[in-house]
């Protein structure tokens, strides 16, 4: 087996090890999630968006499904920083020392952005959508009778994607640090990125202009913010590269 094959096998073994660590931590977090599920469900049932909505179990398994969904979602949120760290640990051997330190700092930023995306969707977007749907049902003279599983499924469909979408600035920072993307590239594909974000917003929201704008505008601003972040990161990378080249010339001289 040549050196290239050994290197490939080493990468595969390292990837398996990182995945195993994530699985172990997820199982531990899932146990914690089983304890968190009930108080979280009780709290969200008492929230303003749910107080006036009669919730019913239309299937025998609905309470169990809701409970397990909350347990797994709680586990994912708890283990999210671990996932980010294991991803960083997998790629960090290929980075310079200063790059490793810089990218390690992205993990808490990414986690807080994830929580920020969840908060934006839950406290701003979700109440508006519930109000819009309730108003539409009233205008159409439709009696609202929601299942608890349907309500919380809709809640997760709105909130969880925003937690992921709010990772865009961190992903852009990381890719810029690795030299994969540049601010110029992000600007050149802006119109295509905007189109993709419009499509994503269309999948998340109901077919109504105001709710669509409430999702689309933050996503477009997030992309523009990512370009600015990429610009700052790119400048730092260029400066470090110049310093590295100067040090190399001095050593050669």
Curated annotation (Swiss-Prot):
Keywords (A to Z) from UniProt: Cell membrane, Membrane, Protein transport, Translocation, Transmembrane, Transmembrane helix, Transport
Stated name of the protein: Sec-independent protein translocase protein TatC
Residues annotated as transmembrane: 19-39, 70-90, 109-129, 154-174, 194-214
Function: Part of the twin-arginine translocation (Tat) system that transports large folded proteins containing a characteristic twin-arginine motif in their signal peptide across membranes.
Membrane topology designation: Multi-pass membrane protein
Compartments it resides in: Cell membrane
Source superkingdom: Bacteria
S-S pairs: none
One annotated Gene Ontology cellular component of this protein: TAT protein transport complex
InterPro entries reported in the protein's UniProt record: Sec-indep_translocase_CS (IPR019820), TatC (IPR002033)
Organism: Halalkalibacterium halodurans (strain ATCC BAA-125 / DSM 18197 / FERM 7344 / JCM 9153 / C-125) (Bacillus halodurans)
Assembly description: Forms a complex with TatA.
Taxonomic lineage of the native organism: Bacteria, Bacillati, Bacillota, Bacilli, Bacillales
One function term, GO molecular function aspect: proton motive force dependent protein transmembrane transporter activity
GO terms of biological process kind: intracellular protein transmembrane transport; protein transport by the Tat complex
Family from the record: Belongs to the TatC family.
């Amino acid at each position: 087996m040549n050196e290239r094959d050994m290197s490939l096998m080493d990468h595969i073994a390292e990837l398996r090890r990182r995945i195993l660590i994530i699985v172990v931590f997820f199982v531990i977090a899932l146990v914690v999630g089983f304890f968190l599920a009930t108080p979280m469900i009780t709290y969200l049932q008492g929230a303003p968006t749910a107080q006036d909505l009669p919730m019913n179990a239309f299937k025998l398994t609905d309470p169990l499904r809701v409970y397990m969904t909350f347990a797994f979602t709680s586990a994912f949120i708890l283990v999210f920083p671990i996932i980010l760290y294991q991803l960083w640990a997998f790629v960090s051997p290929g980075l310079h020392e200063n790059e490793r330190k810089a990218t390690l700092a992205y993990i808490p930023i990414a986690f807080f952005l994830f929580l920020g995306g969840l908060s934006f969707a839950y406290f701003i977007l979700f109440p508006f959508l519930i109000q819009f749907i309730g108003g539409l049902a009233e205008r159409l003279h439709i009696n609202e009778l929601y299942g608890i599983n349907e309500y919380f499924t809709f809640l997760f469909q709105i909130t969880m994607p925003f937690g992921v979408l709010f990772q865009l600035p961190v992903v852009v920072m990381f890719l810029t640090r690795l030299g994969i993307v540049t601010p110029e590239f992000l600007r050149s594909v802006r119109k295509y990125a905007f189109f993709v974000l419009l499509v994503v917003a269309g999948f998340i929201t109901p077919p109504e202009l105001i709710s669509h704008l409430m999702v689309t505008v933050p996503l477009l601003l997030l992309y523009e913010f990512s370009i600015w972040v990429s610009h700052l990161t790119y400048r730092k990378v260029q400066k470090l590269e110049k310093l590295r080249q100067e040090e190399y010339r001095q050593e050669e001289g």
